[in-house]
Every structure is written in C-alpha cells, then in structure tokens.
Amino acid sequence: MDMKLQQVQVLKPQLTQELRQAITLLGYHSAELAEYIDELSLENPLIERKETDTPPLSYHKTNKNRMNAQEAGLQLSNPQKTLQDALKQQSLDMNLTNTEKKIFNYLIHSLDSNGYLEEDIEEAARRLSVSAKEAEAVLAKLQSLEPAGIGARSLQECILLQLQRLPNRNEQAEMLVSAHFDAFAQKKWKTLSVETGIPLHTIQDISDDIAALHPRPGLLFARPEQDVYIEPDIFITVKNGHIAAELNTRSFPEIDLHPQYRTLLSSGSCQDTVSYLSAKYQEWRWLSRALRQRKQTITRIINELITRQKDFFLKGRSAMKPLTLREVADCLSLHESTVSRAIKGKTIQTPYGLFEMKLFFSAKAEASGDGDASNYAVKTHLENLINQEDKTKPLSDQKLVDLLYEQHGIQISRRTVAKYRDQMNIPSSAARKRYK
C-alpha cells in the first residue's frame, strides 16, 4: 500500500496586536489605565487627556467590618520612615558606647518585618566577638524603645514586654503570660482558673486587654492603621425605588486629538513628518476606540448587575442572589473571560458601602433550601445572628443552622455553617463565649 504523508495547514484565528491591547486595557483599573495613557502620551504628541472633575471619595475605615474588610475593603499603605530609622533616632539619648552601638546596629538590622529578633542572641554575640552578657544588655535597651514589644524573640515575650510597659501593671496578666502562656492562648481557661485561683471573668478581662496589644509591633511602621479614602469606579444611587448608575469620569477617561494635528498636516510638511503624524494618528484613533469600547462593556455589565441584583441595591447585603460570570456573559453575548477582565479591580459605591465588582458574582449557598440564596447572603445572615447573640451563651453551629431555616428558609448543613464561619474569621461558639 502506497502511503503518503500530507502536511495539512490548519488556520487558527489570530488576535491582532490592537485586539490584544484592547483586551489588556479592559482589565486595567483606574490607576493602571491612567499610567498607561500617560506613557502613551509621552510617545505620541497627538494624545491629550480630557480634563475631568474630581469625584467624591468613598470613606472606608480599615478593619471596619469582617466581611467588608475581607471581601470589599481595599487597603492603601502610607509608608513612613523605617523601623530601623526610628530605633536609631531613639538610641541617640541612650549614650551607648562604641561596642554597644555596634551591637545595637547589628540587632536592629536582624529584626524581621514584625519587629521580632530573628537571630539567636548568643549567635549574634559570637559574630560580633562580644560576650552573650553584653549582647543581652543591649537587647534589653533595644526592648525598652518604642514601639513596645520591639526586639522580642517570641509572641510570648512580645506580649509580656508590652504588659510590663502599661501604666497600670497587672500582675495576674503578667503571671498568666509568663507561666501559663500555652494554656492561656489555647483558652483552657477553666483549668487555669482552678490552677491559679483567678476567676474566669478576670481571665476573660485579661484576654480582652491583651487583644488590644500589638502582636507584631514592627508592622506599626510598615502598615499604620488609618482611615482610607478610596475613589470608586461606579456610583450606585437609589431614589424612590429607582436604581441609577453613574461612572466616575476619572476611571473612564477620554482623550482628545491635539489641536495642532490638522494644522501640521495642512502646512505642507515633509513626507517624513506626514508619515509620522499619520502613524501617531492611527495610534490615537485606536486608543480612543479602545477606551470607548471599555466604557461600553463595563456599562453593559453594570446595567445587567442592577437588573439581576436589584434586591441587593434596594434591601442590602442579605438580599444578594447567586450569580455567575457565565450567566452575565451569555446574556450580553460576551465571553466569560471578557466579563472577568472587565470587573477585575473595579469598585462600586452603593448605599450599603463600597464593594468590589467581583463581590456581586456570588455562588449559590451549599444545599440552600430556597434555591435562591447566595453564599454571600448566607454569610451576612450568619454574621447578623452572631453579632446579636448572647455572648454568655453563644450560638452553636447547629443552632445557627436552625435559625437560618426558621428565619430565612435557608437550609444548609452544620458543616457548611462552620465553613462559612471560618471563611469570615469568626471563632467557634466556645471561643466566643464570655464569662461575665
């Protein structure tokens, strides 16, 4: 049999460079887009950004709410001077000897980002050719500086250093941390109460006081707690039951053609200049078209979200419905990946706070009895129930299961409740229990 190999050419659709760039542009958030346009305008004199009014900023307080902080919160950093700089500045008042300065500088550069001493003090002494006693003495001076707890070698030491610096020292708290730290941290409080004679409610108070301390003092320099103001990409308002969306013009910029372009073309410029300007004009036209397409795509998605999540905008978080990217993509005749790129990093200001767009795409709750409850809505109900519980008799996971069904017709398993609770960083009923 005469067999011949034949080469078959398979034609595959190829994305043009302009299309690839347009797809990338769709996924940019406002800051990335602004930077991209600025870079292009440096290379293309025909591109001029249209001036826009500055929109209102959205107030977002860090650690304001468990679910908001995790699912909707976008935290910004505000870098200050480094921890090492601050410690060096404080050391100027300590009158250190040259040897002590050498040890001090070595130790502060051996601190990790949390402010803990990474290196064994005896190893540090060996490296510096000093005695362990000298190194320990300088470490004690380092640990006397601000922030309290700096230079600790363990969480236990960090907390103890801070307790010892409190204006009103609590001997019972210091004793629990120094002699019974593991049992205290594991909340074996009933056993501790029997062994130490400290009442349960007092141990609870001590735990509350310790919770207000800083387990990672070094982060006070890297990520100071602050109130943050965020610029939303979309504003949703509700008036008399009517939901309206407004785009932030800074998040959806437009560009103008430099007014001298046509003048230069009609001024009898040389062929090289005309060719250059023509190429730059094509770049300008592509960018203008891509920005317009980005705006149209996101607007269509927003309008679809308003339709499908109407109850959320009218009633709040607990009314969030299950919704997938594919559902919206199919309805708008878009690819699922297009919707995913379009919502990436975009934020919406609603009457109930600031949220990332991706939040509105929430899966159906596991084994939901009513068939129309999203996992986000169920988490909201769980959070509300736990916030309202009697802390001396916290609700068990099974009781939460029962209340979800009784109050909202939502039927999920105890395991699912535990899973959602863990995702929200809410401790178990035993850990939530108060002893007073």
Swiss-Prot record:
A motif (RPON box) lies at residues 413-421. Induction: Association with RNAP core increases slightly during late sporulation but not tested stresses (at protein level). One of its GO terms (molecular function) is DNA-binding transcription activator activity. Residues 324-343 bind DNA. Keywords: DNA-binding, DNA-directed RNA polymerase, Nucleotidyltransferase, Sigma factor, Transcription, Transcription regulation, Transferase. GO terms for biological process: DNA-templated transcription initiation; regulation of DNA-templated transcription. It comes from the Bacteria. PANTHER family: RNA POLYMERASE SIGMA-54 FACTOR. Sigma factors are initiation factors that promote the attachment of RNA polymerase (RNAP) to specific initiation sites and are then released. This sigma factor is responsible for the expression of the levanase operon. The open complex (sigma-54 and core RNA polymerase) serves as the receptor for receipt of the melting signal from the remotely bound activator protein LevR for the expression of the levanase operon. Associates with the RNAP core only in stationary phase cells. Belongs to the sigma-54 factor family. Interacts transiently with the RNAP core. This is RNA polymerase sigma-54 factor. It comes from Bacillus subtilis (strain 168). The gene is sigL.
